[in-house]
């Protein structure tokens, strides 16, 4: 029935000129052809399409059959039917109006979701390439439309991260990346072969957009296999190499992009790139920078005369982009790029003026976020080691400036303790090696004003700030032991009265208040233990106006005793510091009396 219906429509249209075909004819042709496929009359449909007398009809109306044929192929019919469907598809690509066929193919690419995205892309890429190459004009627009549609669909696929996931390629992204490169190659070659052609200049712009989109997705999040392994088996490395190769071929080599990024005058004239640079290009260029400096792809294109500090300056804004993201796969690349850039520098060689550049302060603050908020321990430790490496590379004034910045902005006791330990290390170097004005005298006293104080005086939450307080006390103990009152190299003894008023006395008061509070809570908890055990439930304890999360009574007691132990520890160090101050002051007084 469906075959007869289709033949009837064709017979009626054979006597008409192409421009006389009605909209109704198109609809009836599509409906009858679709029924032929659904009812299994694929061989008869193939014969109708192969008939030379139907060539004009197929040219005008045949593109309507592409959708049903493609869906038939994706359903996976028996082998002979599948082969006939492929023959029909090839004939439609060969005979149909390329403009209509292009739109039909792109609509089909936009339809699916999930794992079907890669299936249909892999099926349609080669026909899509053929159709575009047949277009008489506006090829640049068509290539851009196709690449944009393909990228939009591929960006929906999850990026595999582990070696096992890459090899399994469950969603087909790796296969699609490889196929997409093959799809793009002829158009790149077309740009190279005739650079003076105005249409090719537009085509170059579309290819440039595609390359930057590819650098953002999937390459921004993609993980790469170890370089010692067979690089040919790493689909993302191969994709990255091809993209960087395309950029060079169309006139935008790696040095031009990396060395000119961020300048007022761009290396390209395309308006969209000018307007969207900060939003769209930042992540793409960051991705490119990572590929070049960490993965070594295209690094041979860079001039060898660039200084390590200049390269660091180039990379810092890209590192900032990486660290602003919350995805582990992305900000871990920022850590790698930072490490690669810093290891090129000598210790203490990075001039303090670099901290006047926004990214040079934003990056260490980004590292603090990784150290304090990242759920993965290895990355937290990596962030800590990168912050230490960055500190090591700064000159003395740079270290001093960064310490002040971190103490004012980190709002994290552990980070502040880390900074205070670094301050102690710098003071120690000033004692043991060359006198350093930034960690002695007036400059150091200004820094100690930040360190040897309680954020909220006696009301400070000592438990929450225990890391910082212990580090501050240890620094003060070190200074008292190391610096004699007569020498007063650090300026400590001159400022001792202020330190006692701003730090030691409020700390005493805070400790007494905190210990009394926690001891009362322990007593209450112990009294309530019997009731809680009878109820076989959980109890709650309120500390500092905030309720400790529900937990068994035994666990709450452990938490309270642990807090009390922390206060005892702080108190013992505080007592030792005050004892040392008294001994040192008494010793100096006796010496002065002896001299008189």
Swiss-Prot record:
Q: Which biological process annotations from GO are given for this protein?
A: cell surface receptor signaling pathway; circulatory system development; epigenetic regulation of gene expression; muscle cell differentiation; negative regulation of cell population proliferation; negative regulation of T cell proliferation; neural tube closure; positive regulation of cytokine production
A GO cellular component term found in this entry reads: Cul4A-RING E3 ubiquitin ligase complex
- Xref: Pfam families: Kinetochor_Ybp2
Q: Where is this region: Alpha-helical region with structural similarity to HEAT repeats?
A: 2-555
Record PTM: Phosphorylated on tyrosine residues.
Subunit structure, as described in the record: Interacts with FKBP4 and FKBP1A. Interacts with RBX1 (via RING domain). Identified in complexes that contain RBX1 plus one of the cullins CUL1, CUL2, CUL3, and CUL4A. Identified in a SCF complex composed of CUL1, RBX1, SKP1, FBXW7 and GLMN. Component of a SCF-like complex consisting of CUL7, RBX1, SKP1, FBXW8 and GLMN. Interacts with unphosphorylated MET and is released upon MET phosphorylation.
Instruction: Cite the domain annotation text.
Output: The C-terminal half of the protein is important for interaction with RBX1.
Could you confirm whether the keyword Lyase appears in this record? no
Annotated keywords: Acetylation, Phosphoprotein
Name the phenotypic consequences of knocking out this gene.
Complete embryonic lethality. Embryos are present at the expected Mendelian rate at 10.5 dpc, but all are dead by 12.5 dpc. Mutant embryos display decreased growth, delayed neural tube closure, incomplete axial turning, pericardial effusion and a failure to form an organized, functional vascular network. Mutant embryos have reduced protein levels of FBXW7, RBX1, CUL1, CUL2, CUL3 and CUL4A, due to increased proteasome-mediated degradation, and increased levels of CCNE1 and MYC.
Q: Identify residues that carry N-acetylalanine.
A: 2
Name one molecular function that GO assigns to this entry: hepatocyte growth factor receptor binding
Q: In which tissues is it expressed?
A: Ubiquitous. Detected in embryonic vasculature and embryonic perichondrium, and in adult eye, brain, heart, testis, kidney, smooth muscle and skeletal muscle.
Using the UniProt annotation, give all residue ranges assigned to the region (Important for interaction with RBX1): 299-596
State what protein this is by name: Glomulin
Q: What does this protein do?
A: Regulatory component of cullin-RING-based SCF (SKP1-Cullin-F-box protein) E3 ubiquitin-protein ligase complexes. Inhibits E3 ubiquitin ligase activity by binding to the RING domain of RBX1 and inhibiting its interaction with the E2 ubiquitin-conjugating enzyme CDC34. Inhibits RBX1-mediated neddylation of CUL1. Required for normal stability and normal cellular levels of key components of SCF ubiquitin ligase complexes, including FBXW7, RBX1, CUL1, CUL2, CUL3, CUL4A, and thereby contributes to the regulation of CCNE1 and MYC levels. Essential for normal development of the vasculature.
Q: Which InterPro entries match?
A: Glomulin/ALF4, YAP-bd/ALF4/Glomulin
Under PANTHER family, the record lists: GLOMULIN (PTHR15430:SF1)
